[in-house]
Regions:
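A cross-family phosphate/adenosyl-ligand binding-site feature
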Residues: 1-12, 22-108, 119, 241-246, ...
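Nucleotide/pyrophosphate-binding catalytic subdomain
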Residues: 21, 29, 35-39, 43-53, ...
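Residue-level signature of catalytic and energy-coupling elements of molecular machines
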Residues: 138, 196, 286, 309
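A glycine-rich phosphate-binding loop feature that marks nucleotide/adenosyl-phosphate handling sites
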Residues: 182-186, 237, 287-288, 323-330
Length: 363
């Protein structure tokens, strides 16, 4: 079977630690093992539509293993099938997928590596139907991508969140306060749950378990009766009260994910103060969780994903995403991943562990 001689690569969606590590692994492996040339498209699918690119080689991916972000740039507003175009002072949306295909063909490419989360995989599935062979690589700090046990980016974000919680502990103890720490995660509670457990959180609120403010307040009061005059509350941005709604910070027109969550921490803190008159403070970690040097675990996982993706290219195993199952790297069809998310199951051992530790989950 003849291996491809020229491939493209892009990074889509939000950035996270480990993107450069996976770019490096793909480029080095396809060059060293298969003598394949690589074109890197800039700013996600925007680069494919607008023909913005750089040629990648062993020299320009050297030294990027530990660098955060992505040397290719990224975008979560560049869906080729609903592409934003400024006309008469406002944005309208057009199908420019034919232009993406034209760019692909003009470069003489035989396959495209798409690195991203659920939105990127959904677009990758659609664009593969236009005769662009795809290999997908999963990334997200939210760990919510269906089909893989873990995504790179998650461990780095978990480390950052846990270190922040560790630091907040000391000021919480000193001032006898309830400290509310909000983390990202969208509609999946993995980051809040795992950082809450790792950081010794007393209360953890996630999207999958609607919370009762009375349950939270009772936990805080019980801790006070036991001589613990502070509490650490970790809340995922997608958490919501029982019978209530998530807090939406804003809506971004034209984005594949138009709803921007944020601010649930302020609601929780205000409700606690109103009900039991204890001093609360809010810390929203936000984009801090996306930045910085990837953890060693993420560097290793990203490298494994990149090498495996290169091998799938050589075998022409297109239409698949590399994934981690247990300790093994496997492939799963992208059409089984697109449009699905991986949330915390209610029988998760992490939830059972938290309850065994006496952690309040808001229910």
């Amino acid at each position: 079977m003849k291996t491809p001689k020229r491939i493209g690569i892009l990074t889509g969606g939000g950035d996270c630690p480990g993107l450069n590590a996976v770019i490096r692994a793909v480029v080095k492996t396809v060059i060293n093992d298969y003598d394949i040339a690589v074109v890197g498209f800039l700013d996600g699918f925007e680069g494919l539509v607008e023909n913005k690119f750089i040629k990648l080689n062993s020299d320009n991916v050297s030294g990027i293993l530990t660098r955060g972000g992505t040397i290719l740039g990224t975008s979560n507003r560049a869906d080729p099938f609903r592409y934003p175009i400024l006309e008469a002072g406002k944005y309208v949306y057009r199908d420019r997928s034919d232009q993406a295909l034209k760019t692909f063909e003009e470069h003489g490419l035989e396959a495209l590596v798409c690195i991203g989360g659920d939105g990127t995989m959904a677009v990758s599935q659609k664009i593969s139907e236009k005769s662009i062979p795809i290999v997908g690589i999963p990334k997200t700090i939210d760990n919510d991508l269906f089909g893989t046990d873990v995504t790179f980016g998650f461990d780095s974000a978990l480390t950052t969140a846990t270190e922040a919680i560790d630091k907040i502990h000391t000021t919480a103890q000193s001032h006898h306060r309830v400290m509310v720490i909000e983390v990202m995660g969208r509609y999946a509670g993995w980051l809040a749950l795992c950082s809450g457990i790792a950081g010794g959180g007393d209360i953890i609120l996630i999207h999958e378990i609607p919370y009762k403010i009375d349950s939270i307040c009772e936990t805080i009061k019980q801790r006070k009766y036991q001589g613990r005059y502070f509490s650490i509350l970790v809340v995922g941005e997608g958490a919501k009260p029982e019978g209530g709604e998530m807090v939406v910070k804003k809506r971004v027109e034209g984005s594949p994910e138009p709803i921007r969550l944020g601010g649930i921490s302020h609601k929780v803190a205000d409700d606690i103060e109103d009900k039991i008159q204890v001093e609360t403070r809010v810390t929203i970690l936000g984009h801090l969780l996306r930045g910085g040097v990837p953890s060693p675990a993420d560097r290793l996982l990203a490298t494994r994903f990149g090498v495996s993706a290169a091998q799938q290219l050589a075998k022409k195993n297109f239409g698949h995403m590399v994934a981690l199952r247990g300790s093994n790297i496997v492939t799963v069809p992208i059409d089984e991943v697109a449009g699905k998310s991986r949330t915390v199951p209610l029988d998760s051992p992490y939830l059972s562990m938290a309850r065994s530790l006496g952690t309040c989950l808001g229910d």
